[in-house]
């Protein structure tokens, strides 16, 4: 019981420090809810969470001990702004979770995210109301963390963004990630 209390305290401290020193973000209700979600989901069965940096082209995995692994990755288009609507080929930013692990016929290893979620819909509706996107635009979906095709790992080596908005890892590294990341793992995608 004492160890569990210490672990939860350390997780809380780490999350608070991470979000307070991240100058590009201000703590808000969505981030606070995400921290709470991380604490709820990080158990012995699922100690992981993922932070994806579009700026650094990195997917970082953390566990109860802190940093666990880093994988280079690529995204949708070279336009690294937040996803606005279906078809823009941008990778969405925000807090998500892995909802399905599946084998895709094109690249095998795929971790489907819960995009669009409530926060995604709020941003989408606001942008639509502000006239930033057409009234008939759709939000899109099917965003995942997945592998390249086996013969196309070079796309990651050369930071060649190629997906329709997903996050893509080298085939071999996606296989590694897929082997230990469970459904329910929290994922943050940031600029």
Where are these regions (language model features)?
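Exported/periplasmic cell-wall-interacting domains
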Residues: 92, 100-191
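Bacterial N-terminal signal peptides that target proteins for export
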Residues: 1-9
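Bacterial Sec-dependent signal peptides at the C-terminal "C-region" and cleavage site
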Residues: 17-29
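N-terminal post-signal-peptidase region of extra-cytosolic proteins
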Residues: 32-49, 54-55, 75-99, 126-131, ...
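Well-ordered beta-strand positions in beta-sheet-rich domains
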Residues: 49, 70-72, 95, 142, ...
């Amino acid at each position: 019981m004492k160890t569990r209390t210490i672990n939860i305290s350390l997780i809380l401290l780490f999350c608070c420090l991470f979000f307070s020193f991240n100058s590009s973000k201000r703590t808000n209700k969505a981030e606070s809810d995400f921290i709470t979600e991380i604490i709820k989901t990080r158990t012995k069965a699922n100690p992981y969470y993922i932070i994806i940096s579009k700026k650094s082209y990195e997917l970082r995995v953390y566990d109860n001990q802190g940093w666990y692994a880093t994988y280079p990755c690529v995204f949708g288009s070279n336009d690294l702004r937040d996803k606005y609507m279906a078809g823009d080929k941008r990778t969405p930013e925000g807090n998500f979770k892995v909802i399905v692990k599946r084998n895709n016929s094109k690249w095998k290893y795929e971790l489907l995210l819960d995009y669009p979620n409530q926060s995604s819909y709020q941003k989408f509706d606001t942008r639509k109301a502000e006239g930033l996107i057409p009234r008939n635009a759709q939000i899109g979906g099917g965003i995942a963390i997945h592998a390249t095709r086996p013969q196309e790992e070079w796309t990651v080596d050369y930071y060649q963004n190629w997906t329709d908005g997903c996050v893509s890892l080298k085939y071999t590294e996606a296989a590694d990630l897929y082997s230990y990341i469970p459904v329910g793992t929290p994922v943050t995608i940031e600029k």
